[in-house]
Regions:
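Phosphate/NTP-binding elements of NTP-utilizing enzymes
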Residues: 1-173
Length: 173
């Protein structure tokens, strides 16, 4: 069943008109883990992109991020893993970019070879947001995982959020 899911997912990614999949599933089918692995996979091969996670509550989105996305990234082999900024087990954002370095007068005026051979990062991030109608408003997302979106609690509404996130996905593609 997972093979068919990923074949269909590849077809969705190839179609520019497609925003994604509304995947209805049985309990304990592993969708959260499959979507987390696809998020990390896409993030490690994309440059200058943003990936997001929303769930039925902000606590569930954070749990998906810390318990699924971060361990998948942590267990990547060193030859697939891009340069990462921040902690090895982040709580809010997984950033594939070159860590910031302190600017000094010497480093600004220096024209040594080390400045010209600077590392290049992907400038890609994966993060999660609290559940809300305006989550990810005004941002550009390459991929958004709506986990358990049918279980949103009032007053938040998935339809109102979709009006916002549809535009962010269109801008980020």
């Amino acid at each position: 069943a997972n093979r068919l899911f990923f074949i269909f997912w590849e077809a969705c990614k190839a179609d520019n008109r497609c925003y994604g999949i509304c995947y209805l599933k049985n309990r304990r089918s592993g969708f959260s883990f499959m979507s987390s692995s696809e998020t990390v996979n896409q993030a490690t091969i994309s440059s200058d992109a943003r990936f997001g996670i929303l769930s039925k509550t902000g606590a569930d989105a954070k749990k998906m991020f810390t318990d699924k996305v971060v361990p998948i990234s942590t267990h990547y082999p060193f030859f697939f893993k891009p340069i990462q900024d921040g902690m090895d087990r982040p709580k809010t954002e997984l950033a594939y970019r070159v860590p910031a370095s302190k600017l000094t007068r010497k480093s600004i005026t220096s024209t040594t070879k080390s400045n010209t051979d600077a590392l290049e990062g992907l400038d890609t991030t994966i993060d999660w947001k609290n559940t809300g109608d305006n989550s990810y408003d005004g941002e550009k997302l390459r991929l958004l995982v709506h986990d358990e979106s049918g279980k949103w609690e009032r007053p938040d509404n998935i339809l109102n959020n979709w009006r916002v996130t549809k535009t962010t996905l269109r801008l980020g593609s």
